[in-house]
Design a protein with these regions (language model features):
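Short gly/pro/ser/thr-enriched loop/turn and capping motifs at secondary-structure boundaries
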Residues: 33-36, 50-57, 103-105, 118-121, ...
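Active-site/ligand-binding-proximal alpha/beta "capping" segment
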Residues: 76-124, 376-386
């Protein structure tokens, strides 16, 4: 039997080649692979010896030769193919082992592989006669099958071919998207080639009768790949969805210890304090009923003191933090066996959002904050105090991550009332005021979009809110400003809407 080996990633290769030689394989290797085998005293022929042509153009042309591709592509069931091989003294390959230049990790012209994908596609096309191995993780299985059967089975060859075409498809997609990203004339390219690989099978989807899985882009490492589930049940679809929202939202804030609580992808608690234990306690006080069974994100290490505070509060479905002390982890894992405890790195900022509409897609760039706090405009006669500036920032960011129509009320760096997902802004305001209770007096409220009429602002002002933040932009803006002046509240226009659906 005969094998062609041309790999960039050489992990596990020496043991694999040793196994092939022990099975009596005749080996042909290209470029750096040949050098490695020679250094390890492994018998083989170089591609140059087979083709009679030296590699050229700094290695860009090595295996693109009839003596190589004829040996890969020959359909040995056809007499004409066998005659062509005999006429040219070409010996067919039974096995092609190949992986690619690291374009996923280092995009660039010089990491665009040409010969590798060509060999892989040729071998995968001819999987009736050739086994193509593109993943070092398959080496041991291939050796075991060769030892047991004397050849690679048809079923295995087919599954290897599928993996090979998936690899070349992902590889080409990465190159296409990289080139498209270089065109600065359009914020969104005319074509987006999306390839995904399954990263995890989930217990179920949004509901128990639905199947679910987490996928990722090949070669693009998500923070989820480095997150560690330290205790508790496996994560469900909704656990991941809400935890992702909570962790990303918490990282909108820097500096002080902070805790965010998310339920059904909406904030229902938030607090910043000088001590993380106080932040945890205060975050739950904002809406303790909704917080039960929620996702709790913490931006500090969890020690025994914080673990004690966590155990004194309603049960969370998931707790995510940068790290946990061993004693704290053991305590919580014992007392709250079903709570999922996750240690996670800082989440990356993705540039686009993708949603499905039937068989099509909606794509937009991510809703980032483009207008800085310092550029907000106070449009009312009343002004806000210096100690309300941070509350304005918190309320505005909370509001942007809450389902529209959204009204968020904040006081002393704590969310005290959140009205989310209502079909009219007045109802959102009334819900937020009701949840805030007596704390509403002297608070800051934020609206994710403009007030179309003064009734929403009146509901907040009459309850005792002293500062209201809104994008502005309504044809009735002056009416809204007049209403704020009548009530004596400070009104801020940000100039930036943050609908969320």
């Amino acid at each position: 039997m005969r094998a062609l080996i041309s790999v960039y990633e050489k992990e596990g290769l020496i043991d694999f080649v040793k196994g092939l030689l022990d099975l009596g394989f005749d080996l042909v290797a290209s470029g750096g692979t040949s050098v490695l085998l020679r250094e390890n005293g492994m018998a083989h022929s170089s591609v140059e010896e087979v083709t009679g042509a030296a590699e050229m153009l700094d290695g860009r042309v090595k295996t693109l030769h009839p003596s190589v591709h004829g040996a890969i592509l020959a359909d040995l069931d056809k007499e004409s193919h066998r005659q062509d091989l005999a006429k040219r003294s070409i010996v067919p390959f039974d096995l092609v082992v190949c992986n690619l230049y690291p374009f996923f990790e280092r995009p660039g012209i010089e990491t665009i592989d040409v010969g590798g994908p060509t060999m892989i596609r040729a071998a995968a096309k001819n999987h009736a006669h050739v086994a193509v191995v593109v993943d070092p993780a398959d080496y041991s299985e291939i050796l075991s099958e060769l030892k047991a059967l004397g050849s690679v089975s048809a079923d295995t060859r087919r599954s290897l071919a599928l993996k090979a075409f998936e690899l070349t498809a992902r590889y080409d997609a990465a190159i296409s998207n990289w080139l498209a990203g270089g065109d600065s004339s359009e914020k969104l390219p005319k074509r987006i080639t999306l390839t995904l690989e399954r990263a995890a099978i989930l217990r179920y989807g949004e509901n128990p009768h639905q199947v679910g899985a987490r996928y990722r882009q090949p070669g693009v490492r998500s923070w989820w790949d480095d997150a560690r589930l330290l205790s508790g049940m496996e994560l469900s679809y909704l656990n991941i969805f809400d935890t992702d929202a909570a962790w990303r939202f918490l990282h909108e804030f820097e500096g002080e210890p902070a805790v965010a609580i998310i339920k059904h992808a909406n904030p229902c608690g938030f607090a910043m304090r000088s001590a993380i234990e106080d932040a945890y306690k205060t975050a739950f006080e904002g809406d303790p009923i909704s917080a039960f069974g929620g996702i709790v994100a913490i931006n500090r290490n969890v020690d025994v003191s914080l673990a004690g505070m966590i155990l004194s509060k309603p049960k969370a479905d998931v707790i995510i933090a940068p790290s946990y002390d061993d004693e704290a982890l053991q305590l919580m894992a014992t007392k709250r066996k079903n709570t999922r405890l996750i240690a996670a790195p800082v989440p990356e900022r993705s540039s686009i959002e993708v949603r499905t509409i039937g068989s099509g897609f909606l794509i937009q760039d991510r809703d980032n904050f483009r207008v800085a706090l310092g550029d907000f405009k106070v449009v009312s006669k009343a002004q806000l105090s210096d100690d309300q500036v941070l509350d304005v920032d918190i309320a505005w960011k909370l509001c942007a991550r809450t389902s529209s129509n959204a009204i968020v009320i904040v006081k002393d760096k704590m969310a005290i009332g959140i009205g989310a997902g209502q079909q009219n802004r007045v109802d959102s305001a009334r819900i937020a005021v009701e949840k805030a209770g007596d704390k509403v007096v002297g608070s800051v409220a934020a609206s994710d979009a403009f007030f179309p009429f003064r009734d929403g602002l009146d509901a907040l002002a009459n309850a005792g809110v002293s500062v209201i933040v809104s994008p502005g932009g309504s044809i009735r803006d002056q009416e809204i400003i007049d209403a704020a002046d009548e009530a004596g509240v400070a009104l801020i226009f940000t100039g930036e809407r943050h609908f969320r659906h």
